[in-house]
Regions:
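Short loop/turn segments immediately following the C-termini of beta-strands
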Residues: 10-12, 58-60, 102-104, 112, ...
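Short loop/turn segments immediately following beta-strands, especially the blade-tip
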Residues: 22-28, 70-71, 110-119, 165-171, ...
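A short beta-strand motif characteristic of beta-propeller blades
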Residues: 31-37, 73-79, 122, 128-133, ...
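Blade-loop segments of beta-propeller domains
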Residues: 32-94
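Beta-rich, blade/repeat-based domains predominating
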Residues: 39-49, 81-92, 128-148, 180-195, ...
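Asp-box/WD-like beta-propeller blade repeats and closely related beta-sheet repeat scaffolds
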Residues: 74-142
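Loop-centered beta-sheet repeat module
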Residues: 151-206
């Protein structure tokens, strides 16, 4: 069986924009890297159910978001002065797209137009700072939906996870804020499919916080666990976090140690570290589990390679198949 994999990239060196490749799930191989669309540093991608592609985008020196049709043709940009976004997500129910702007500390809401294009519906600016040198101001790194359809943001600069109520027209109202460990740097969050549990990966202190979620935007801390070996003393920053479809295993990436941390999810939703798998590349900013759950594809921003792992569905553990497929400056892996 062949699946199409899409890659978001930086375009600082050799990359031209958004790429795709064919993944053969029987062989565990990637083939036929193809440029889908030229776009300046499309570092995060999201598809809607109709097949429109939304990416971090830029135009004429301004930053924002780009919308593409099913064939990869540009529909429009929505941009303003300053740096582009760092995260994009689709809300099918409300016909919206969400964006996070790291440099401006903003969460943005876009209305989807009839042709799949976008227009800005609302935005909110975060304020504050943290203890770490990378926390001089608010840095919103994530904006997506909770299981009960609230908007949730992770702010790396303020160590805060904020939930918003979203009106039908895209207007947002803050509901509640969870404060993670000081200097932790909240980056991304995923929610368990069965338990009222969320997993928050923190970039600056290389941890995952396990949170009890009560369903109305409120969190309580359950556990904090490291993503690193106990004896590691080098520089590291975490990046992506993914949950297996059966809810039994959790994965997080380390940049610096250049590895994937693998956790077993226990009966109360807490985590047990069971493996740290080297990715054999530099700076694994993103990875994803294939739709059939049998493989993981990790990409490396600095070494321009994709690493393919076989995933054991019973144990959750990973075995590397290869690490030599070329993808320039890749920082996002997704499937249509």
């Amino acid at each position: 069986m062949t699946q199409t994999v899409y890659f978001g990239t930086y375009t600082r060196r050799d990359s031209k924009g958004i790429y795709k490749a064919d993944f053969n799930s029987n062989k565990g191989t990637l083939e036929n890297l193809t440029l889908v669309a030229e776009e300046p540093s499309p570092t995060y991608l999201a598809f809607d159910k109709a097949g429109h592609l939304y990416s971090v985008g830029a135009k004429d020196g301004q930053g924002g978001i780009a919308a593409f049709d099913q064939a990869g043709q540009l529909l429009n940009h929505v941009v303003e002065e300053g740096a582009p976004l760092c995260y994009v997500a689709v809300d099918e129910e409300r016909n919206l797209v969400y964006g996070a702007n790291y440099h401006k500390g903003q969460v943005l809401v876009y209305k989807r137009l009839a042709d799949g294009g976008l227009e800005l519906a609302d935005s909110a600016s975060h304020q504050g700072q943290g203890l770490h040198t990378n926390q001089a101001s608010a840095h919103v790194h994530y904006a997506d939906l909770t299981p009960d359809q609230y908007l949730i943001t992770c702010d790396l600069g303020t160590d805060e996870v904020t939930t918003y109520d979203v009106a039908a027209d895209g207007k947002i109202t803050p509901l509640d804020t969870y404060k993670c460990a000081a200097g932790a740097g909240a980056r991304h969050i995923v929610f368990h499919h069965h338990y009222k549990i969320a997993y928050l990966i923190c970039e600056l202190n290389s941890t995952i916080e396990v949170l009890i979620y009560d369903g109305v935007g409120h969190f309580e801390h359950l556990q904090t666990i490291s993503t690193l070996p106990e004896d590691f003393e080098g520089a590291n920053g975490t990046a992506a976090i993914r949950l297996s479809a059966d809810g039994k295993f959790l994965y997080g990436s380390n940049r610096g140690h250049d590895s994937l941390a693998v956790y077993k999810i226990l009966a109360d939703g807490s985590l047990e570290l069971i493996q740290i798998a080297p990715t054999n590349g530099q700076n694994p900013r993103d990875f994803n589990i294939t739709p059939d759950q049998n493989h993981i594809i990790a990409v490396h921003q600095d070494s321009d390679n994709a690493t393919i792992f076989k995933r054991d569905a019973e144990s959750g553990k990973l075995t590397e198949i290869s690490h030599d497929f070329y993808v320039p400056e890749a920082v996002c892996v997704t499937f249509k």
